[in-house]
């Protein structure tokens, strides 16, 4: 369905607009964070006093969440839109669910058919749990291996591929009835600063930005993405004042809306992030972003009431025209109309919610993606199928397998090496070294470079087949020539461990390709 193509029902939205006060309208622009930790009564107060437009779900248990949403929606005169940052599906906020692969693993797939299916399956899950908006996918081009915040959230380092794969995921989710948001405009891939902590700078000229950062966003717009999320970035070529992109009129209104032709909803990245919240008093940030052209103001810093009041005051004082306010509120109401939220109070059935969401079809699809994305970087000297295969050697004891502990120490690595000593081949599974907050040292008593050095030395003493259950950038840190074989499984979840096991046992072939250039190997490489 084309964005905002809702037949004759627009009359209802116009009637609502005419009846709404400035306070009613401004409240619809704000989406506030909710989690199991949210104090009782806090959201109720914001619904009653500030008339907020929606919530973003952080973390909760599914049945508790469903009951809370049902109770809260009953109190909202205009039903709230429920949103989520669910880049790898509902499991990102409801951790009892099986996790969909991250975008970089999807980027290892050879075509987009399966990516569309992933989008549809994600949408089915979101709709079952009453989520209307997913702030995904990331269409940033991750062409900087040192990027601390995007990494596996990107489809890769090729803008054309990122655009193509992002469009497939968007199509799948939107066809499934869920609003999606291409992010982080104008592009967060080639940065070495996390915008949660500071303001990153993109120092490139306009020609480079058009060819790399902006390309996937333009393609998403051409493919009718319904929402674009603006990130917190300093882009001098687009706005020489140094204003963060989320507060920049030249970037949001002149570039995104006018030049690139985006007619949908512009949503901010979280406005409490330090990439923007330290730029001015926190309660002034939402107002500045709205003046710049944003439509929906996501997760302002804790001064929620003051933030909303400041926008109301600006409208009443004439700093913001009533027409400008109506323009954004109209978009929000039309979105709610398309979602059926204006037809009555929504209800999330808590009964069998887990069983309905974690279906066999979803689990099978996730395994199918994991199987299809395994990437052979260096084919082992031993055959993977037939007589004398690696699987036969493992059964006879001539080859042994070991899974390294995430909380690695020199002692644990020495122990792992000793456990396979004497074997002709050692199959070593290297887990993710990524901690929840991107603190690479949290899982280990050793620095990553020490771990990679140990493994490279080990490979010089024994035929080591390395299964990298992490992103491909590990290839930049190891001596590829030292290893007898290298395969990439992208993460340590059970489905990926199983998929790599299938490849090494000869049950399936490795069909994935490198989604990024790494280890001196090009994007799209696979060892056939």
What is the role of each PLM region?
Residues 109-131, 138-154, 159, 166, ...:
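A substrate-binding/cap region within the structured catalytic cores of diverse enzymes
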Residues 44-58, 120-134:
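Catalytic domains of carbohydrate-active enzymes, especially glycoside hydrolases
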Residues 46-60, 145-146, 221-242, 270, ...:
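Short acidic, glycine-rich surface-loop motifs adjacent to enzyme active sites
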Residues 4-46, 258, 280-528:
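Preference for extracellular/luminal or secreted protein segments
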Residues 21, 55, 63-80, 84, ...:
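Second-shell residues forming the walls of enzyme active-site clefts
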Residues 29-38, 103-117, 198-212, 272-280:
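Active-site mouth loops of central-metabolism enzymes
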